[in-house]
């Protein structure tokens, strides 16, 4: 028997249920989805993360799970390096899509996302990152910044 096909909603800094493009995308698909949050052990050790920040995230996830329980859904809270966690999930499921918001943060989160993108490409997983805050990752200069800003503003 084959693995269960699933989509994954990867919650990063966008801890909410209202007006959430990743949840909306997962709901519009005809396969089950697994909402996850990863306390990435490679990221939380950096000095820009505090116990207060981690407590806020934990309590926000508890609140989301209270709301999702009426839909028989729950955010699975995971701890470890993100790539290792996605490899483990791939051993359990046939991952079709990963839906998340594009994160803008520290260099380490950018490097993590590059590793996850390579993993997705190697395993034929579609990773759809929704634009959240008008930041365009990976650009080398600000040429066409005004044009890009207007496009994002009116999407």
What do these predicted ranges mean?
Residues 1-155:
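Active-site "lid/cap" and pocket-lining segments within catalytic core domains
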């Amino acid at each position: 028997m084959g693995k269960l096909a699933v989509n994954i909603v990867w919650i990063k800094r966008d801890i909410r249920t209202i007006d959430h493009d990743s949840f909306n995308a997962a709901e519009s698909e005809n396969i089950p989805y697994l909402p996850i949050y990863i306390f990435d052990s490679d990221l939380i050790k950096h000095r820009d993360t505090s116990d207060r920040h981690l407590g806020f995230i934990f309590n926000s996830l508890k609140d989301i799970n209270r709301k999702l329980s009426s839909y028989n859904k729950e955010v699975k809270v995971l701890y470890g390096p993100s790539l290792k966690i996605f490899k483990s999930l791939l051993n359990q499921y046939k991952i079709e899509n990963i839906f998340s918001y594009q994160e803008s943060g520290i260099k380490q989160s950018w490097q993590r996302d590059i590793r996850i993108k390579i993993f997705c490409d190697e395993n034929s997983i579609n990773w759809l990152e929704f634009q959240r805050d008008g930041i365009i990752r990976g650009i080398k200069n600000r040429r066409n910044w005004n044009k890009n800003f207007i496009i994002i503003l009116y999407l």
